[in-house]
């Protein structure tokens, strides 16, 4: 399988800085791709720091597996790898926050698509979304991980 990846981000018209990070890796064999998007929380200092920390942690954690390190490619093993990657990202953000009072409220959304052959494994936190685009149709693959979404689903 051959992957073609491109990424672009724009700060928008409201923010003074771009707090988004888009990054990816494709292994040498061309059968796996890791796609990562993070959107720092606007309105708080350090969103760009949190999003960069999160993306770097995910890539650091998962790159050995996509590069061909021995790993069990079952859904359970993939889920475990993704959970560890998200935990590492969270740990890095928490550690950085605790070292700088100005960054105490920094945070980020995070979306990861780990594509193996023709199957995508998606993990996310926050309200950044992952879509599947086929035949000019976009289908949302994620559910917003927010208080508002929970209230809507609960009928609150």
Question: Predicted segment positions?
Answer:
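PP2C/PPM-type serine/threonine phosphatase catalytic domain
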Residues: 1-156
